[in-house]
């Protein structure tokens, strides 16, 4: 247990950390085929960051997972809150067998439905439109449409008929 404790003098830990960072510079990954696109633009052959490599791979998945996780946790919290509110409203804890069929029927049907009465709105009204007839209605003769406002050489079909006569 004593071996896991930090030294009592804080000045001992700092030089060891500095030595670790100095010698760790030789252990950086060199640019290979899989890491070539993440290398610095300078002359050093070391990769800039593994976080950039991992970040490009996992960024979309991580964001979608975080959003899904937050929505899922909010749903669970809402469900628990609704359950607690229902229990508080009833002033009792929920137990198996408390809700019986008679209790459900009393909630759903507090009394007998009213007797059936004839609905006067369904009667045939005299102000309905006349029934559909297949005979075409007589339409008044229409005058031809006005000439096309664009190019004077273009004529509408009615003007072509008039011009041909």
UniProtKB/Swiss-Prot annotation:
Name under which the protein is recorded: Cysteine and tyrosine-rich protein 1
Signal sequence residues: 1-29
Keyword Methyltransferase: no
Transmembrane segment boundaries: 62-82
InterPro entries per UniProt: CYYR1 (IPR022640)
Extracellular face residues: 30-61
Polar residues bias (residue ranges): 154-165
UniProt region (Disordered), positions on chain: 125-165
Location, primary (coarse class): membrane
Keyword terms, alphabetized: Membrane, Signal, Transmembrane, Transmembrane helix
Residue intervals on the Cytoplasmic side: 83-165
Family per record: Belongs to the CYYR1 family.
Topology with respect to the bilayer: Single-pass type I membrane protein
A GO CC term attached to the entry: membrane
Localization, UniProt: Membrane
Taxonomy, superkingdom: Eukaryota
Any Pfam family matching the protein: CYYR1
């Amino acid at each position: 247990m004593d071996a896991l404790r930090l030294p009592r003098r804080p000045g001992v830990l700092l030089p060891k950390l500095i030595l670790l960072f100095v010698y760790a510079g030789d252990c950086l990954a060199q640019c290979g085929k899989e890491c070539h696109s993440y290398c610095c633009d300078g002359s050093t052959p070391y990769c800039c960051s593994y976080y950039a490599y991992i970040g490009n791979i996992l960024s979309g998945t991580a964001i979608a997972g975080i959003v899904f996780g937050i929505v899922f946790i909010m749903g669970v919290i809402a469900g628990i809150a609704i359950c607690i509110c229902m229990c508080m409203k009833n002033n009792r804890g929920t137990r198996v067998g408390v809700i019986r069929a008679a209790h459900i029927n009393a909630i759903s049907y507090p009394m007998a439905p009213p007797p059936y009465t004839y609905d006067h709105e369904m009667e045939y009204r005299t102000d309905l439109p006349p029934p559909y007839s297949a005979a075409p209605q007589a339409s008044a003769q229409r005058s031809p449409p006005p000439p096309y406002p664009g190019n004077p050489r273009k004529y509408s079909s009615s003007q072509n008929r008039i011009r041909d006569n």
